[in-house]
Design a protein with these regions (language model features):
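A beta-rich soluble binding module of mature secreted/lumenal proteins
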Residues: 5, 10, 20-185
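Hydrophobic helical h-region of N-terminal Sec-dependent signal peptides
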Residues: 14-18
């Protein structure tokens, strides 16, 4: 049985999240980083694990963070984010939609608290849809996501180089699983 945060607490987290992401979005260099093209939303669906993130107040002390994306018949996406906090699995649900319906651009709008939406921009996606980098409207938000709970040091280094090139504060990244597998190069 899942333990859930009280609804009003989830709504508070979502409202803060949306306000922060939209606060200075139009002036952010993150808007200059293009989303991936030739994006296949069906292939993106399923479970993703959070490998790294910039710190923010709605995921404080959250570990084992993961997201499950489920495409609906109307083209919207059901989002279920979950993670461990104080040894309890918590979850937050949202709905997402394409910014440009029918396009192959990796850019979605996500609402944890209707009618407010925030940007979910996929700025890197490997060809097998197993490793992704996602941002919002500002340089304060970025996530490295993987289909696997652990990634290789090479994969992490590649992501960090891209983030650094784009101007993200990689020294501030948090690694909520603490699991990074080293492999021979």
């Amino acid at each position: 049985m899942k333990n859930r945060l009280p609804r009003n607490l989830i709504n508070s987290f979502a409202a803060i999240y949306i306000l922060l992401l939209n606060g200075c979005g139009n002036f952010s260099p993150a808007n200059e980083i293009p989303p991936v093209k030739n994006f296949n939303i069906k292939q993106y669906m399923g479970k993703w694990y959070e490998i790294a993130r910039l710190p923010h107040n709605f995921e404080v002390d959250v570990t084992d963070a993961q997201a499950v994306y489920t495409l609906q018949d109307d083209g919207t996406v059901i989002v279920e984010n979950s993670g461990m906090k104080n040894h309890v699995r918590t979850s937050a649900h949202a709905i997402a939609r394409s910014v440009t319906p029918g396009s192959e651009i990796g850019e979605l709008e996500v609402s944890f608290f209707y009618p407010f939406y925030t940007m979910y921009k996929i700025i890197y996606l490997d060809k097998d849809y197993t490793l992704a980098i996602v941002t919002g409207n500002s340089m304060d938000y970025v996530w490295i996501l993987s289909r696997k709970k652990v990634i290789s040091k090479n994969e992490l280094d590649m992501c960090l180089k891209m983030l650094e090139k784009w101007g993200y504060a990689i020294k501030l990244l948090q690694y909520p699983t603490g699991e990074i597998m080293n492999i021979a190069q």
